[in-house]
Amino acid sequence: MKSLRFSSSLALALAAVASLVAGSARAQAAPDAPALYRQHCAACHGEQRTGGMGPALLPESLERLRRPEALKVITQGRAATQMAGFAPALKAEEIAALAQWIYTPVLPAPTWADADIRASRVETPGAKDLPAKPVWSADPMNLFVVVEGGDHHVSLLDGDRFERMHRFASRYALHGGPKFSPEGRFVYFGSRDGWITKYDLWNLTVVAEVRAGLNMRNVAVSGDGKWIMAANYFPHTLALFDADLKLVKTYAATTADGRASSRVSAVYDATPRQSFVVALKDIPELWEISYDPKAEPLYDGLVHDYKMGEGVPKPGQFGVKRSRLDEPLDDFYFDQAYTHAFGATRPKGEGQPNAQVVNLDVRRTIARLPIAGMPHLGSGITFDWQGRRVMASPNLKDGAIDVIELDSWKPVKTIRTPGPGFFMRSHEKSRFAWTDSMMSPTARDTLTIIDKTTLEPVASVREPGRTLAHIEFTKDGRYALASVWEMDGALIVYDATTFKEVKRLPMSKPVGKYNVFNKITRSEGTSH
């Protein structure tokens, strides 16, 4: 018995040693992802993965790129870019290690200070001397800027003939919608990894570029065209530029006492107020930053003792006016008077999404919107219905359009759709609103058309088995343009009255299209 116990113990010990040896061998054979990155990737994507010739490879920048897609890109490369596939050079396990490693945080965390922003700026020689008139013959007010996310290009479309006029390469992953100067000559693009590109539409050339941050949400252009503001996720900052993309100042996205900081959810221009309005992702505040040279001075908090210096104001222009909220806003849009901001909250953990109305004059939440699910208020529209002003918004969770009266903040109707959607669009001269169901696995191929006078669905158009989304109208509202949101996609032109297809242009995942006139006139049917 003693011998048997000894043999068993010896066997267990030998098995343990064998397991350790095997584990050690596996560890030694495991690919060294940091070394592989330095050898194959750093030259284009930067030593700290902050980007260079190629985009940033930070977790914040890759949050919308699924890991299987990242693996595919490393393996096969990207068409029409300098990203070559590494399948011939690396083993499958090495590629897998790289794909996993780029989603891990960089330590120590990279920084992006004012000096870095200024050093990043480049200007195209001679761009300022280009003629102040288009080099092409189309209507500059009915021009469409089409962002093709499939191969990171931008197409310019004649909105009368529906012909592509020009196509050029863009920065990686443009986001948040391009913004136009007030006369429609210049367009400003913001990329996920922080670059702002100023492009001269009339002369078909880049004017200047600057990197505002390492991970950026969107940009806004002031109504007078003099100022550009960028909202950053990383670092937690806002960056203010002049029209030539020269840095004016940065704002730390923190509470007034500096104890908490936040990602910046979005920044939008409020032209009638001569200000930028800013939502913070992690702090329950909505900021308003005036660019009016005659803006009234700002006082932080209550002034009750001038001897303590509490009555000393801050300059009104470019100062931060804070509206304190119960919960942070993920995104928002305005009523046509720009008195109210409608924002959606995406709480963490067990909390439920909700919507709130912020009065920008009294600087507080004045109503909660009775919307279930996950409202996508950043894509809402407003219009008149039976003598009342209403807003309508798609829902990211439920197949529904919620219609709310703006005077009472009470629900008017919930319009059922085939599935949850992301975009809703209309036009002042059109009777109809169009919405997609692109968040639905079964109805992503369907656009639902709603009669704004009856609030009833009246028709639908389909692209079977493919994603159909993001409507934009021509400046006169006669035609509606939709995206087949696929790599081998297309731009489809529909008659906005009969809903019949008029023309189809092949494009590479046209994620968004933007009409110059509708954007600069702040059409009630599109995002601002």
Features from the language model and the residues they span:
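Extracytoplasmic electron-transfer domains, predominantly the class I c-type cytochrome c fold
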Residues: 43, 48-52, 57-106
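Short loop/turn segments that connect beta-strands within beta-propeller blades
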Residues: 159-161, 200-204, 242-246, 291-293, ...
